[in-house]
């Protein structure tokens, strides 16, 4: 029977017991944790500043009170709003001995009351540290915090959280707690469902944000892993490429076809193998092979190759010839000594123009004439026949206007420089018949056999070198020509631009002005 009564009492007490949640707020150094310890009866317990959140459970009558002790620092006040949806009431602690912070405390409490979850919830205000001489009374605290305009149920209780040693806990602490619990009890039927609903909404919102945050972190982690994998694959490809091509011939040479395949053979006939190493000379490869590969690659690549010159190259100087110029200035007339100091050449017989006469060979350079190859015949041009005869003008005494009577050492259509100036008729005729000295002209345009001299036209460098006939057959003049030619600048119409001499030096035919002939080795001076 006694056991049944005990169980019935416990059942009734459990049914009437209610749970409420209270948030303990206030600025830093206001005494929040000390006040909570005093309510619990732990007066002598040392406290430290609260950084974050502490939870404590109290029993008051039929209520089980859960207290959230939140830190009051500036960096911690931002987290207060996360707990306001779960509380039924608030305990706000003010340092009454520090009136200078009333304004800061007022702004902080106003931000809390403006939160949507604090609507119509009671507030218990403790004006702490009343034992200090600078402590403000409750009326000044109400004025300093601006509680006159507060719409929430509120009440101010001056108190001293930390009593001197040997004294009991300040009863005003218990009075303020009883007032708050009684106010919540009167509104419990309205507050509790609202607190449960708002707390659930906040938990769901927090869960949703947490899930989004985790999803965002997961995507970022996957993106980092993907980028890391791509970088590793790219690094492996580069490493593989380096292993395949580092020190090896390029893959384009392995094809072996087209221009590149043909050019890969090299210049000296050295074939480049596909696996042949390309290294500088002295490092596992000889210099000629590397040079051949370089030239082969250069030929295989697209290049713009200029077309060769239109004029045939000048004859190469024979090895046994004199190292000076092959074209030397000589006296063009009879009885005049040659440039080398030998006897005079004399006049060319008239029969030589017809191909039957053999001119006398000079005794100065017989080995040069014997070493030169015969001049190949060239095709005649229509503009050469019978034109240069009337245009030839000689400055030598006794010179004729006909090309057949011209000195053998002077090309037709050119004026020699040793005689007087030609007259107007000779100059006009020369302008009509003279051509470019570099244009190829036939040697037989004036008629005659292989040894005849062409008239009225310029001559190729080979013709000026060899004279008018073949050397081996003994035909033509053996004299070295003194080409005092007038170069045509308008397509061969004979506009005189000045005199120059053709000097063959270092395998090249170079036009030299008369005043510069003294500086050329082997070229005599007119003076």
UniProtKB/Swiss-Prot annotation:
Region (Disordered): 200-252, 300-503
Subcellular location: Cell projection, Cilium membrane
Protein name, per record: ADP-ribosylation factor-like protein 13B
Binding locations of GTP: 26-33, 69-73, 128-131
SUPFAM superfamilies: P-loop containing nucleoside triphosphate hydrolases
Domain of life: Eukaryota
Compositionally skewed regions (Low complexity) per UniProt: 381-444
Keyword annotations of the record: Cell membrane, Cell projection, Cilium, GTP-binding, Membrane, Nucleotide-binding
Molecular functions per Gene Ontology: GTP binding; GTPase activity
UniProt feature, compositional bias: Basic and acidic residues: 200-248
Assembly behavior: Monomer.
Alphabetized InterPro entries for the sequence: Ciliary_GTPase, P-loop_NTPase, Small_GTP-bd, Small_GTPase_ARF/SAR
Lineage of the species this protein comes from: Eukaryota, Viridiplantae, Chlorophyta, core chlorophytes, Chlorophyceae
Family: Belongs to the small GTPase superfamily. Arf family.
Cellular component GO terms, alphabetical: ciliary membrane
Record remark on domains: Contains an incomplete active site due to the presence of a Gly residue in position 72 instead of a Gln, probably explaining the inability to hydrolyze GTP.
Native source organism of the sequence: Chlamydomonas reinhardtii
Compositionally biased residues, Gly residues: 445-457
Signal peptide annotation: none
Pfam families xrefs: Arf (PF00025)
Entry function: Cilium-specific protein required to control the microtubule-based, ciliary axoneme structure. May act by maintaining the association between IFT subcomplexes A and B.
Gene of this entry: ARL13
NCBIfam families: small_GTP
């Amino acid at each position: 029977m006694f056991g049944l009564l005990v169980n019935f009492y416990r059942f009734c007490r459990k049914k009437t017991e209610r749970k409420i949640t209270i948030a303990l707020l206030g600025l830093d150094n206001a005494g929040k944790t000390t006040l909570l310890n005093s309510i619990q009866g732990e007066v002598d317990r040392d406290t430290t500043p609260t950084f974050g959140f502490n939870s404590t459970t109290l029993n008051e009558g039929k209520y089980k009170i859960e207290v959230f002790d939140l830190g009051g620092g500036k960096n911690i006040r931002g987290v207060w709003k996360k707990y306001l949806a779960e509380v039924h009431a608030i305990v706000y602690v003010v340092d009454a001995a520090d009136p200078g912070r009333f304004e800061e405390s007022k702004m902080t409490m106003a931000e809390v009351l403006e939160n949507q979850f604090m609507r119509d919830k009671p507030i218990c205000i403790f004006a702490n540290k009343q034992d200090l001489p600078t402590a403000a009374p409750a009326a000044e605290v109400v004025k300093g915090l601006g509680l006159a305009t507060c719409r929430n149920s509120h009440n101010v209780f001056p108190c001293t959280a930390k009593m001197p040693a040997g004294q009991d806990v300040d009863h005003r602490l218990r009075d303020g707690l009883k007032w708050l619990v009684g106010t919540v009890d009167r509104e419990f039927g309205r507050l509790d469902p609202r607190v449960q609903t708002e707390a659930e909404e906040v938990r769901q919102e927090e869960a949703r944000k947490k899930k989004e945050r985790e999803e965002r972190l997961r995507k970022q982690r996957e993106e980092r892993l993907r980028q890391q994998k791509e970088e590793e694959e790219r690094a492996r490809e580069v490493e593989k490429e380096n292993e395949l091509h580092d020190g090896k011939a390029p893959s384009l040479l392995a094809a072996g076809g087209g221009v590149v395949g043909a050019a890969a053979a090299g210049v000296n006939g050295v074939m480049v193998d596909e696996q042949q190493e390309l290294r500088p000379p002295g490092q596992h490869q000889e210099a000629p092979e590397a040079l051949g590969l370089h030239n082969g690659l250069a030929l295989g690549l697209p290049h713009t190759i200029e077309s060769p010159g239109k004029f045939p190259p000048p004859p190469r100087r024979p090895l046994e010839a004199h190292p000076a110029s092959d074209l030397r200035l000589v006296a063009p007339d009879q009885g005049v000594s040659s440039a080398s100091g030998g006897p005079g050449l004399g006049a060319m017989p008239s029969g030589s123009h017809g191909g039957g006469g053999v001119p006398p060979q000079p005794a100065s350079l017989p080995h040069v004439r014997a070493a030169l190859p015969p001049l190949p015949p060239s095709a005649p041009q229509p503009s050469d026949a019978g034109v240069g005869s009337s245009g030839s003008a000689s400055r030598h005494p006794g010179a004729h206007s006909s090309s057949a009577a011209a000195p053998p050492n002077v090309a037709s259509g050119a004026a020699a420089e040793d005689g007087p100036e030609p007259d107007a008729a000779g100059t006009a005729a020369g302008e009509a018949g003279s051509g470019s000295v570099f244009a190829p002209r036939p040697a037989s345009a004036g008629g005659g056999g292989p040894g005849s001299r062409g008239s009225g036209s310029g001559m190729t460098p080979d013709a000026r070198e060899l004279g008018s006939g073949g050397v081996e057959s003994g035909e033509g003049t053996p004299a070295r020509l003194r080409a005092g030619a007038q170069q045509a600048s308008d397509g061969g119409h004979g506009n005189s631009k000045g005199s120059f001499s053709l000097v063959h030096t270092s395998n090249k035919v170079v036009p030299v002005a008369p005043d510069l002939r003294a500086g050329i080795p082997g070229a005599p001076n007119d003076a």
